C-alpha cells in the first residue's frame, strides 16, 4: 500500500512537467522516481533535491549526470561501463551518477543490470513507459523526447549544461568527461578539502594549509551564527567527530592550537 501511494504521488508530481528541459534550464528539484538499484538510503524514491545544496540537509551541492537507458538498448550497454569508470573516479569528488532505466525484462531486470555491469551508483525506474508517451517514460520525456542512451549533466546550480541522445563512442565519453571535470572545477563545495581545522583555507608559500587562531575565530563565528553550515565547514570543524559543530569543538580546537598540534 505504501509503495502504491508513493507511486501515485510521483505520478501527480510529474503531471506538471509538460516541457522538455534542455541546456540552460534549471532542472526541477522536486522531480523523483522510485529507486530500484543500489539504494543505500532506505528511501523509496530518489529526488533531484537530494543533491541540491540549497535544499538538502548537508548543504553539499553536486554535479549530476543522468543516463537514461532501456534494458534492451545495445548502445546503452556500450556506454554503461564508462559511467562506472567515471563513478569510481569522481564519487568522492562531488559527482552523482543516476541511471534512469526503463523497459525492464528485455532482457535485464533492474537488479540484473546492476549485477551484470558491476554498477555502484543509484538506479531509478522510469515510469509509464509508452503508456502516455510516444517513446520512453516520465523521466526520459522530462529531458528529451528522442532516443536512448540519453545523457543529461546538471551543474551545482541545478542548471542543465549538457543534454544529448545517442552513444558516440570514446569521443563522446571524452566530451562528457571534459564537461564533468569543468563543472566540478567550478564548484568549490563539491570538491573542497575537509582537512580538520582548515576553516579559512589559507596556505603558505609552499601551498601547505595554515591552521591558526584565525581558523579558530572563524569556527567561533560559524557556531554563533544562524547561517547554514555547509558540509566542508562541518568536516573542517568537527573536532569531536559527532557530526555537529558546537562549543565543545571550539574548546578542542583551542586546546590543540595551544599544544602546537598544527605546527609544521
Go through each PLM region and give its residues.
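Positively charged n-region of N-terminal signal peptides that target proteins for export
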Residues: 1-4
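N-terminal "domain-start" segment that seeds a small globular fold
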Residues: 18-56
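Hydrophobic h-region of N-terminal signal peptides that target proteins for export
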Residues: 7-18
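Structural microenvironment flanking redox-active thiols in thiol-disulfide oxidoreductases
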Residues: 75-118, 129-137
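Thiol/disulfide oxidoreductase modules built on the thioredoxin-like
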Residues: 117-119, 127-179
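Cellulosome-associated attachment modules in secreted, modular CAZymes
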Residues: 185-264
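Short active-site neighborhood of thiol/selenol oxidoreductases, capturing the structured segment around
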Residues: 47-77, 83, 97
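Loop/turn elements at helix/coil->beta-strand transitions in domains of secreted/extracellular proteins
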Residues: 59-65, 91-98, 117-122, 148-149, ...
